Amino acid sequence: MYDYAFVHLKFTIPLAVLLTAIAYPVLNRIHVIQTGCLIFIAFTAALPWDAYLIEQKVWSYPPEAIVGPRLLGIPFEELFFFVIQTYITALVYILFNKPVLHALHLNNQRNPPAWMRIAKVTGQLILVALSVWGWKAAQVNQKTTYLGLILVWACPFLLAIWTLAGRFILSLPWFVTVLPVVLPTFYLWAVDELALHRGTWSIGSGTKLEYCLFGKLDIEEATFFLVTNMLIVSGMAVFDQYLAVIYAFPTLFPKVNRYPTPLMLVQSRLVNTTKYDLERIEGLREAVERLRLKSRSFYLANSLFSGRLRIDLILLYSFCRLADDLVDDAKSRLEVLSWTAKLNHFLDQHYGDSDATEDPKQKAERIDAYIKEAFPPFAYQALHLLPTHILPPKPLYELIKGFEMDSQFTFHGSSDSTNLKFPIAHDKDLKTYAIRVAGTVGELCIALIIHHCLPDMSDSQKRRLESAACRMGIALQYVNIARDILVDAQIGRVYLPTSWLKEEGLTHKAVLDNPEGPEVIEKMRRRLLDNAFELYREARPEMQQIPSEARGPMIGAVENYMEIGRVLREKKVGQVFVRKEGRATVPKQRRLRTLLRALYEQ
């Protein structure tokens, strides 16, 4: 009795609830709109087709297997299947695609490799052939009727989608398109096999080939679930392609609302690919790789941000890391001062007093010329793509001052011990340094979040958030220093305040010679961590005021980094994993648990 309803209660609804619970922390309004639009399209496209199948006796349902209500002869349980299948497959697609930055896969839209052009044309020809064959096969009362009706209905839609987004789909990593098709398909095959075995629904004899994939699962039913899931996944990819165009190219779409409008999606489809700034895509690719190599915690957290905010945060990190590397890789203090002077002049080019009548294009060309003249080629993209039109100048200048403080340390390999200089003399110097190299980054991140998520935020709320972000940045830097005492000592640096060392009867040389030895160093590490967690507890409640789209990912990034401090405090075997260079980190599973806990708490 009511077997079809129980199929949903036992198999489709529980899976949908489970996937919703898993995906909930990363879902945003764009995902909801995207999935809702696809459900509407799938429902309206399948409705007349399904009604025709029932009218022609291809599908039938025993009266006792359904609740009763119908629309165009279609049981409500079947109508619900249109919705729930689309929802399930869309969620699987979203989960697999969340780490992917789709903008990186737009470069093949203009200059695709030969294999991609061949694959797209081949796919089009195959879909045309299947559509024609399906039309001929879909004659009433013959063994190919059902299979033909599936192909003549689905293949034209697939052909249209493949024509629109074939290159983009081929550009994506295979697992983000193939697995969202395969996994729901296998699950629904198993559900269908059980339903057919119980007689919940049946396929009319004489309209099918009488071949089964396994058990009672007819080849036609297997084909149906496969092609419908292909439609859903490729439909989601079309949305993502046009969203990627909107987010990736600010010259084409200077102002993007929190949620792009349908008109913007149409406009992104109509943009000629010759207008794509492929140099920007390449620069973004470099920035992502720099983030991946240099910060595993923030690389993981960044994938949870969305839209242009995610891109601008990556570009900000790339600039900060590049500037830091220029200082750290310098061979002399003079070279460090040269780099900091050039970085300051670069900022002056953007923020300094300039001729108000200067054409913006000429200004951009002037700045580009300076970058190419003053910096090595590998630095060009990180400097060129920095979103200075959004970022406030003061934190950027303060960041450079932080690098200048680094330049006061003895350089690795120097044999002149008489010139040792350690700029962190007192607590206030430690705080100043942390503000400059980390508090500023927190302020810059908040500036990007406010610009993209809530530009009309009140000034008082902005100031509170900026202050909290600065304090949290200081806390993270204290954790960083506590973690890297050994690593810093290996390059001649001691960030522990001189006053702390004197209290414990230590010298800088003692720390450099044996950074992990004396118990008093561990005592100072704990003191540093205590300061970090005190600042963390002060700033953490204020972070709840971050706009909802960015709150979870931002807090997740913070919690992931503070977890390093927690495991340093615990000192449990297996909890702190020390890499070869002496830097402690958190096991991957624990990082993931920390991130998920932070997201679900939001």
Swiss-Prot record:
Xref: Pfam families: Lycopene_cyc, SQS_PSY
GO terms under cellular component: membrane
Region (Lycopene beta-cyclase): 1-241
Phytoene synthase as annotated region, ranges: 248-602
Principal localisation: membrane
Domain of life: Eukaryota
Source organism per UniProt: Sordaria macrospora (strain ATCC MYA-333 / DSM 997 / K(L3346) / K-hell)
Pathway: Carotenoid biosynthesis; beta-carotene biosynthesis; Carotenoid biosynthesis; phytoene biosynthesis; all-trans-phytoene from geranylgeranyl diphosphate: step 1/1
Topological category with respect to the lipid bilayer: Multi-pass membrane protein
Family: In the N-terminal section; belongs to the lycopene beta-cyclase family. In the C-terminal section; belongs to the phytoene/squalene synthase family.
GO BP terms in the entry: carotenoid biosynthetic process
Keywords for this protein: Carotenoid biosynthesis, Isomerase, Membrane, Multifunctional enzyme, Transferase, Transmembrane, Transmembrane helix
Subcellular localization: Membrane
EC number in record: 5.5.1.19, 2.5.1.32
TM annotation in the entry: 6-26, 30-50, 76-96, 118-138, 146-166, 168-188, 230-250
UniProt catalytic activity: all-trans-lycopene = gamma-carotene; gamma-carotene = all-trans-beta-carotene; 2 (2E,6E,10E)-geranylgeranyl diphosphate = 15-cis-phytoene + 2 diphosphate
Protein name: Bifunctional lycopene cyclase/phytoene synthase
GO molecular function per UniProt: geranylgeranyl diphosphate synthase activity; intramolecular lyase activity; lycopene beta cyclase activity; squalene synthase [NAD(P)H] activity
